[in-house]
A protein has these predicted regions:
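Active-site helix-to-loop segments that bind/position phosphate- or nucleotide-bearing substrates
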Residues: 2-5, 11-12, 18-22, 26-27, ...
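Glycine/small-residue-rich interface belts in oligomeric ring/scaffold proteins
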Residues: 31, 38-93
Length: 344
């Protein structure tokens, strides 16, 4: 079951009662004292976003959330995620998984990054194709990626992608500190990063030790690696907001709610579809198997174009071939309304 993302953007008091997250929201109280009181089962929660300086959360509440492998995000005064709290233990055989990860060979890491870069480029190509942009060069770059991507095809593809993905009238330049809608991308990526880090912990892996990213100041190198092919799903949400003509100069509650919905976006794997939060768990589980030498293929989703067809067959990513053809539709179960984000 997909876990829920709870966003708190107003003053509130969060505590633990009967294995439930007890929520006291003074701003909702009117004539009835019960109006401002809600509760959510701890076991249903995946991520809690604290986005107001007047939120109080008890020690017992945090302990219960972490015990159930939930992540806690704290936002700064500009409403951007500033910190992430994760469980210390997320898997019953965590020590064994750590050993496998630490012993992973350099050739394996290079091959895993090759697959990661290919998946990212192909998903970026799908987004561009959906906007009527020719993607022949993107497909060529994806096909040309070698282990560890020494030719930097991932970088070339990114430069082309950001040049054309947004309407030209915006004169968009991707820069973390740049003009909107960079702010929307930053927020969406931060949520995606938290989802990925949580999934890695639940798979018994160290978020610090990446397969490609290795900045000594970055505690989430592996999360930054694994989230790469999932970034285009955030991009699509941002594009929808821009195309709908919404005011994206500031992170409004409406926009934040839409971006928090990234967890329930459908992602397509070889034989099934699933909500993104579940999909990332499948990806991190396959990564753990790679480190354990049970397989050499990491499981990533490939996006479909707006016409429902894929640019490439799923096996292209692991076989190094780009056979441009659509696959047959496969069944999936969409997330229910109760499984989607739960903003407060």
């Amino acid at each position: 079951m997909i876990k829920r993302i709870l966003h708190f953007g107003n003053p509130g008091y969060l505590s633990l009662k009967d294995r439930q997250l007890a929520i006291d929201l003074p701003h909702l109280k009117t004539l009835d004292e019960k109006d401002g009181k809600k509760s959510v089962p701890i076991e249903d929660i995946g991520i809690v976003v604290l986005d107001h300086p007047q939120i109080t959360i008890t020690h017992g509440c945090m302990e219960a959330l972490l015990e159930n492998n939930a992540a806690i995000i704290v936002c700064d005064k500009s409403h951007h995620p500033a910190g992430l709290l994760l469980p210390m233990e997320g898997h019953k055989t965590q020590s064994e998984h750590y050993k496998h990860q630490l012993k992973a060979s350099l050739p394996l890491k290079k091959q895993l990054w090759q697959q990661t870069a290919q998946a990212k480029i192909l998903n970026q190509a799908a987004v561009l194709a959906g906007r009527g942009i020719d993607t022949e060069n993107m497909l060529y770059w994806a096909r040309s990626v070698r282990p560890d991507d020494p030719d930097n095809y991932e970088g070339r593809a990114a430069a082309f992608y950001w040049r054309y993905v947004f309407p030209l009238k915006l004169k968009f330049v991707r820069d973390r500190l740049g003009e909107p809608p960079n702010n929307l991308l930053n927020y969406g990526y931060a949520i995606l990063r938290a989802i990925t880090a949580r999934a890695l912990v639940s798979s018994g892996l160290l978020t610090t030790l990446g397969i490609h990213h290795h900045n000594k100041y970055n505690a989430y190198c592996l999360a930054d690696d694994i989230m790469e092919p999932y970034r285009p799903y955030v991009d699509q949400l941002v594009l929808q907001i821009v195309d709908n003509g919404e005011d994206f100069t500031e992170l409004s509650n409406s926009i934040k709610a839409q971006l928090l919905g990234i967890a329930s976006v459908d992602v397509q794997f070889e034989k099934n579809r699933s909500p993104l939060m579940v999909g990332i768990q499948n990806t991190t589980a396959s990564l753990a198997k790679c480190f354990a030498k049970e397989t050499r293929k990491i499981t990533y989703p490939l996006m479909r174009n707006v016409d429902g067809k894929r640019l490439v067959k799923y096996k292209a990513i692991t076989e190094g071939l780009l056979d441009v053809a659509a696959e047959e539709e496969v069944p999936y179960q969409k997330a229910s309304e109760d499984e989607k984000e739960y903003p407060f």
